[in-house]
Amino acid sequence: MAGAGERKGKKDDNGIGTAIDFVLSNARLVLGVGGAAMLGIATLAVKRMYDRAISAPTSPTRLSHSGKRSWEEPNWMGSPRLLNKDMKAGLSRSLQTLPTDSSAFDTDTFCPPRPKPLARRGQVDLKKSRLRMSLQEKLLSYYRNRAAIPAGEQARAKQAAVDICAELRSFLRAKLPDMPLRDMYLSGSLYDDLQVVTADHIQLIVPLVLEQNLWSCIPGEDTIMNVPGFFLVRRENPEYFPRGSSYWDRCVVGGYLSPKTVADTFEKVVAGSINWPAIGSLLDYVIRPAPPPEALTLEVQYEKDKHLVIDFLPSVTLGDTVLVARPHRLAQYDNLWRLSLRPAETARLRALDQADSGCRSLCLKILKAICKSTPALGHLTASQLTNVILHLAQEEADWSPDMLADRFLQALRGLISYLEAGVLPSALNPKVNLFAELTPQEIDELGYTLYCSLSEPEVLLQT
């Protein structure tokens, strides 16, 4: 029977060969030389495919004694003309998923590969956690060693500011008793314990008293200038209350109270009328007015190597609107008063941290220290960074101290996104774009610097 089977197979094989020979021998007569050649090549390819099919093992996974597969993959799998790039990639991934260890195969049956242990995923998560903890430790170290100001230095700087404020208040009451002012008070990041690196800056707010029936404020977006975040202070009822009815009529330009003229008035007092060397000698400080254009600024040396800058900031309050005489960056808007949002922003930040013992203020102080120590980030202001944190606080609820690294990275990504859009809306007044005073070039430089550091944020801590 075996012999008959072998003869039958051989007969079948010879029959196919005889048929092929007959076709090839007669093709020349019918198709000519060229056609016969093409038909011969095609017929030979069919015969090789037939030979491979009848010679392949019954199981494609049966192994030879060497442990490798006993049949080779078809040559067309490597042909660049038959496989495009996507197919090659898919094929490569498919081949890589096949087990290559010989122990994964049995000589008779195919055993599916064992699933990867869940421990590997846990190891990846652990590695990420270690990287996050490493950044967390670096952030805390940076804050302790670079950003935080010693309590003693803060106290001495505040005391110097309080002493100078008291002297200025006494002088104004004595020399200009008719100037309607409320009590001056200190403000700024040093006063709110949000200053970083050095205790070198504080603001002295000088509130003007305006008659409510003689003055009104007009939002900048409602004017032809269309500048949200700024206001015009207009003189009202001039037909019933003529010029001179208010002390501050002397600072009116074109029917509006000019912050520049108000600042010039105080400059004459601060820089020209007060004997600061004598006051400094009395207080054991070195005090001198800053040179122009910082007209309303005092430079104070309260210790041998400690300096403090005090900014005098005239302020007006009309209803619920608080404005300060900090000019717009562009000169054509020097008649506008700036809306004061910093006190409300700081109060919200402090309230959020007090509610859950969060790390929002800590994250903000680290960002401020980085920007203060990195010249390329010098255009970013404390208000902009504060609003980035406030926006992030609306998205993320967990601000526990161990989440500092995650929130720091999120703040960086958020800041980059705002720079990319060119818009950072105020968290308290979304109509105000806090990037409006930056030039496109400055925005590009800030975004580029932060984007380059995103892959390795530790670089920011080395400045």
Swiss-Prot record:
Pfam families linked to this entry: Mab-21_C, MID51-like_C
A molecular-function term among this protein's GO annotations: GDP binding
Entry protein name: Mitochondrial dynamics protein MID51
Family: Belongs to the MID49/MID51 family.
Recorded topology in the membrane: Single-pass membrane protein
Key word Glycosyltransferase present: no
Region of interest (Disordered), residue spans: 57-77
List of residues that carry Phosphoserine: 55, 59, 79, 94
UniProt-annotated binding residues for ADP: 187, 189, 201, 340, 342, 368
Function: Mitochondrial outer membrane protein which regulates mitochondrial fission/fusion dynamics. Promotes the recruitment and association of the fission mediator dynamin-related protein 1 (DNM1L) to the mitochondrial surface independently of the mitochondrial fission FIS1 and MFF proteins. Regulates DNM1L GTPase activity and DNM1L oligomerization. Binds ADP and can also bind GDP, although with lower affinity. Does not bind CDP, UDP, ATP, AMP or GTP. Inhibits DNM1L GTPase activity in the absence of bound ADP.
Stretches of the chain found on the membrane's Mitochondrial intermembrane side: 1-23
Organism: Mus musculus (Mouse)
Subunit structure: Homodimer. Interacts with DNM1L.
Region Important for interaction with DNM1L, residue ranges: 160-169, 234-243
Cytoplasmic side: 47-463
Compartment annotation: Mitochondrion outer membrane
UniProt keyword annotation of Glycoprotein present: no
